[in-house]
C-alpha cells in the first residue's frame, strides 16, 4: 500500500486518478465500523432470528394496503389471499415455545451489544413498561400477537383491519426495529458502501496500471472461482458415480 501510494503521488495525473483511493478506503472502513454491530444484529437477530418476525415482515404490504384509502378491493383481496396462503406451511413446523425463547434472547443481545443511539423506540418501551425484562416482553408478544399461532393468524385474515394490525405487539416490534434501521442505518451503510466501491475500483485500476505485467484474479465472490489441480471421477457411494 505504501508503494502504491508513493507511485500514485509521484505523478500529478496519477495522483488525480488514484491518490485518494487508499485514504478513501481507510475512511470508508472506519465509517462502516460504526454500523457493524447494528447491521450484523439486524441480519442475524431480526431477519434470520425468531420466525414471528418473518411472518410480521411479510405482512407489511398488506398492512400498507389496509391503511391506504387508495387500495382497490381486488388488490386488497389478492394480498389477503397471498397472506392466507402462507399460514399452513409456516405454522406446520412453528414451535411457539422455542420461538419465544429465541425472540427474547436475541432482542436482549441486540439491546446489550448495539450502541444505544442505534436502538429502535421499542427498546425504550421494553425498558420502561417491562423494566428491561425481555422474557416478560416476549411472553406478552406471544400471548397476544396474531402471528403467534395459526388460529390467531387465520382469524385475523378472515377479517383483517388496519387498527388491529398496527396495535399488534409482534407487528409493532418488527416495524419499530426495521423502520428505525432503514431511516438511521441502512441509508448510511449504502452510502458508505458506494463510496467504498468507488475507491476500490480506483485502487484496482491503479494496481493494474502500476503492474501491467501482473495477472490479477477476479473477485471470487462475484465470478467463477479459480481452481488448481485436476478434476477426477468421484464415487461417493456404491453405485453412484460422478
Please describe what each predicted stretch is.
Residues 1-242:
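Terminal presequence/propeptide segments associated with secretion/organelle targeting
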Amino acid at each position: 500500500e505504501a508503494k502504491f501510494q508513493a507511485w500514485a503521488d509521484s505523478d500529478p495525473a496519477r495522483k488525480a486518478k488514484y491518490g485518494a483511493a487508499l485514504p478513501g478506503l481507510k475512511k470508508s472502513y472506519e465509517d462502516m465500523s460504526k454500523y457493524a454491530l447494528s447491521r450484523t444484529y439486524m441480519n442475524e437477530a431480526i431477519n434470520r432470528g425468531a420466525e414471528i418476525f418473518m411472518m410480521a415482515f411479510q405482512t407489511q404490504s398488506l398492512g400498507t394496503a389496509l391503511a391506504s384509502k387508495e387500495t382497490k378491493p381486488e388488490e386488497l383481496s389478492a394480498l389477503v389471499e397471498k397472506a392466507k396462503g402462507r399460514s399452513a406451511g409456516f405454522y406446520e413446523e412453528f414451535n411457539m415455545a422455542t420461538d419465544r425463547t429465541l425472540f427474547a434472547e436475541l432482542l436482549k443481545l441486540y439491546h446489550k451489544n448495539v450502541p444505544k443511539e442505534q436502538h429502535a423506540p421499542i427498546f425504550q418501551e421494553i425498558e420502561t413498561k417491562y423494566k428491561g425484562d425481555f422474557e416478560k416482553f416476549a411472553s406478552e408478544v406471544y400471548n397476544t400477537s396474531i402471528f403467534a399461532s395459526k388460529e390467531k393468524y387465520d382469524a385475523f385474515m378472515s377479517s383483517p383491519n388496519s387498527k388491529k394490525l398496527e396495535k399488534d405487539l409482534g407487528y409493532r416490534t418488527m416495524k419499530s426495529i426495521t423502520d428505525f434501521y432503514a431511516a438511521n442505518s441502512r441509508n448510511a451503510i449504502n452510502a458508505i458502501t458506494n463510496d467504498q466501491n468507488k475507491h476500490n475500483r480506483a485502487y484496482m485500476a491503479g494496481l493494474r496500471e502500476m503492474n501491467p505485467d501482473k495477472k490479477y484474479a477476479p473477485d471470487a465472490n462475484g465470478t467463477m472461482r479459480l481452481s488448481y489441480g485436476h478434476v477426477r471421477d468421484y464415487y461417493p457411494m456404491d453405485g453412484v458415480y460422478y
